[in-house]
């Protein structure tokens, strides 16, 4: 529950030929911390991701109550499959309400096309692999671990600094868990 008993959801926009590997670690962090993750698509139902997996999304984007969204996540891939006004309009509404919006690889292109990257630092205009500026996180495909960690930090998913450092050591530095 968020402030005032408001239900909050972390929404992941999936689509045919999206790159699921770019968001697998982030989804793990969300689920492991009890977050209410909703997989949506333009039309509810089965999508086939770039890696060949079939995923059944539980909601169409048009059915998402944007006032209950804590974060909105867009992986990269063939973004022509989400090049629709409903996506851009939803992003603008979420952005204006301060919702965390995260796009990796071509997902960041969608944020740019929606006009959300004007006047902020992003992986689209900078030489950085992963950038957080206010309520927007963007990353290049190779930065999927940094993307997951930065988004998790923005959502306050880590118990404390030690939890964060253990996560970095395990996922980014490939050190064994103690």
Predicted feature residues:
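Active-site-adjacent pocket-lining segments in enzyme domains
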Residues: 9-18, 24, 28-45, 53-178
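Acidic surface patches and DE-rich sequence motifs
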Residues: 49
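Short, Lys/Arg-enriched N-terminal segments with co-localized hydrophobic residues
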Residues: 1-7
């Amino acid at each position: 529950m968020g402030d005032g008993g408001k239900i909050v959801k972390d929404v992941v926009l999936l689509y045919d030929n999206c790159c699921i590997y770019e968001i697998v670690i982030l989804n793990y962090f969300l689920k492991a911390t009890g977050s209410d993750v909703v997989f949506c698509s333009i039309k509810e139902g089965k999508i086939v991701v770039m890696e060949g997996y079939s995923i059944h999304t539980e909601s169409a984007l048009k059915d998402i109550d944007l006032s209950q969204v804590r974060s909105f996540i867009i992986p990269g891939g063939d973004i022509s499959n989400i090049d629709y006004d409903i996506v851009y309009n939803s992003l603008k509404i979420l952005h204006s309400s301060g919702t965390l919006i995260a796009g990796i690889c071509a997902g960041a292109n969608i944020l740019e096309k929606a006009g959300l990257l004007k006047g902020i630092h992003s992986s689209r205009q900078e030489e950085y692999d992963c950038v957080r500026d206010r309520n927007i996180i963007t990353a290049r495909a190779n930065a999927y671990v940094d993307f997951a960690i930065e988004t998790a930090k923005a959502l306050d998913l880590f118990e404390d600094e030690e939890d964060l450092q253990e996560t970095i050591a395990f996922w980014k530095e490939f050190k064994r868990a103690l």
